[in-house]
A protein has these predicted regions:
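Flexible, gly/pro- and Lys/Arg-enriched active-site loops
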Residues: 406-445
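Short gly/pro/ser/thr-enriched loop/turn and capping motifs at secondary-structure boundaries
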Residues: 195-198, 221, 290, 317-319, ...
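Short, basic/aromatic recognition patches
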Residues: 75-95, 233
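Zn2+-dependent cytidine deaminase-like catalytic core
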Residues: 106-222, 308, 341-347, 403-405
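Residue-level signal for inorganic ion chemistry
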Residues: 83, 101, 167, 207, ...
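Short beta-strand scaffold segments in enzyme catalytic cores
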Residues: 100-106, 245-246, 459
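Active-site ligand-binding patch in enzyme domains
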Residues: 138-150, 232-236, 240-249, 253-390, ...
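Conserved histidine-centered catalytic loops in small-molecule metabolism enzymes
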Residues: 433-498
Length: 498
């Protein structure tokens, strides 16, 4: 199986135009370290210093990796924040491509903006240039030949603010660098640097060679956070893992008798479906399947993308009539059952069951066992990565969460806490397993952030070296609030696009 992609409706809330490069949407400046979004890196120290200056409205100057000085002021930060807000709109739709936003500005006024809306469709830069033409009445679309100007001459001398360095290679469509050059863009302001080794900075080089001024690392930390999934996947070739659970105020995920519906309220449960929409795959253990018979689908008020469903089932106990298996013949998202059972042994009953499951559209994935005879988390992640799965939401149960934490595979954790006390020594907690033998061996999750969802609290934890996917709603809303506040003060020349 060459790759797995999330099935998506033809249209959600977003409109789209054009085609996208099937591999990376943008490739960037050379990264010397594996994870470009590590908060402790030197590059992010520059970015955070710059962000602090932006907040004070002061110019910031620092060297980028090409050795050139980078200067930007409060206006640059403001327009980049708008590009970030636009980029978040593609969350859940662009995988395995990155999230990218672009704003075109001339003389302090926004003349075009766009974002990478869906995998297989136009990139942010071409959408923004096409928007320039639409706003000026110059044509109905930016779907032009590779060397044509999507902006129809409307972007001459303008500045393009892009959250990720523009791509410079040819895939399903020409490079975005060519579109920016053809449009007569005079300056490109870049937020993040792409760790994709295919181009290693050639995008900025191509723009500079064409006489375009390029300033990098504007709001670098915030732009890096946009693409923590993409950066992790492009450098590690394994999914970015988010562990999630819901619990009572005393740390219980169910009553002693097993009743767990519902710990949290409707607002928290709706937020879980946002996570399912944004991440490429969802994982549970066979115990959850046997107890709850779930579908593991994304159910939002508006159409969402559906995650690939993964069940850890070391002994292939999954019922052939369960909701997950039945849904495979109804056009639902792909279902992968990861097992250590001897499915390759033709004489084994497991082999016959695996064939029956396969005939119904289930992929039975044979995975090496760990020391305890369970599905090896590290082997599973490598196999999912080879199938193009760039992110994984681990929803439990407690044994599965323990396996991922014990394997050191969790990039981020999300806990929904309800104002209830369940009590009872036998009531389960979120993470099972042997546990830490002493406090020094406990898994450190780093500083927490929180959101209030109805009566519940959402806690988001990112271990050192990881950015936060689950907090993206908060970031996007803050970016929009900043923009509207600036507009109220007369600083923003136009309102954000709807």
């Amino acid at each position: 199986m060459a790759g797995i992609t999330k099935p998506q409706p033809q249209k959600g809330n977003e409109s789209a135009a054009g085609e996208a490069v099937a591999a990376s949407a943008c490739d960037g400046l050379t990264q010397q370290t594996g994870n470009a979004c590590a908060p402790g890196s030197t590059q992010n120290a520059h970015a955070n210093a710059a962000d602090a200056d932006d907040a004070r409205g002061k110019p910031s100057t620092f060297a980028n990796s090409a050795g050139a000085g980078c200067e930007h002021d409060a206006d640059d930060a403001r327009f980049m924040r708008r590009a970030i807000e636009l980029a978040w709109r593609g969350a859940g739709w662009t995988s395995p491509n990155p999230l990218v936003g672009c704003v075109i500005v001339r003389e302090g006024r926004v003349i075009g903006e766009g974002w990478h809306e869906r995998y297989g469709q136009a990139h942010a830069e071409r959408n923004a240039l096409a928007d320039c033409a639409l706003r000026s009445g110059q044509g109905a679309s930016g779907q032009l030949a590779s060397h044509d100007d999507p902006a129809h001459g409307c972007a001459q001398g303008a500045t393009a603010y892009v959250t990720l360095e523009p791509c410079c290679h040819t895939g399903k469509q020409p490079p975005c660098t060519e579109a920016l050059i053809a449009a007569g863009i005079a300056r490109v302001v870049v937020g993040s640097r792409d760790p994709n080794p295919l181009v290693a900075g050639k995008g900025c080089e191509a723009l500079r060679a064409a006489g375009i001024r390029v300033d990098a690392d504007v709001l670098r930390a915030a732009c890096d956070e946009l693409n923590s999934v993409f950066f992790h996947f492009i450098t590690h070739k394994t999914p970015y893992v988010v562990a999630k659970w819901a619990m009572s105020a005393d740390g219980k995920i169910a009553c002693a008798a097993g009743d767990a519906r519902w710990i949290t309220g409707p607002e928290a449960r709706a937020d879980v479906h946002e996570l399912r929409h944004r991440l490429a795959a969802i994982c549970v253990g066979i115990g959850t399947v046997l107890a709850d018979d779930p579908l593991l689908t994304c159910r939002r008020d508006t159409p969402g993308s559906q995650p690939v469903r993964v069940v850890l089932d070391s002994r292939l106990r999954i019922p052939e009539d369960c909701a997950l298996v039945r849904s495979c013949s109804e056009g639902a998202a792909p279902l992968i059952v990861a097992t250590c059972a001897p499915v390759a042994d033709e004489a084994s009953p497991d082999a016959a069951k695996a064939k029956r499951l396969a005939s119904r559209g289930v992929e039975v994935l044979s995975v090496a066992p760990d020391a305890a005879g369970r599905v090896s988390v590290s082997h599973l992640l490598a196999m999912l990565g080879s199938r193009g799965v760039d992110s994984l939401l681990v929803e439990g149960g407690a044994g599965v969460l323990a396996a991922f934490f014990e394997a050191g595979a969790v990039n981020e954790a999300v806990a929904y806490v309800a104002p209830k006390v369940i009590g009872g020594a036998e009531a389960p907690s979120p993470v099972a397993g042997k546990g830490a033998p002493c406090m020094a061996d406990a898994v450190a999750l780093g500083r927490a952030t929180s959101d209030v969802l109805g009566d519940d609290v959402k806690l988001m934890f990112a271990p050192a070296g990881s950015a936060r996917v689950a907090s993206q709603t908060r970031i996007a809303l803050k970016a929009a609030d900043d923009w509207h506040a600036s507009a109220a003060e007369g600083g923003a020349p136009c309102s954000p696009a709807s």
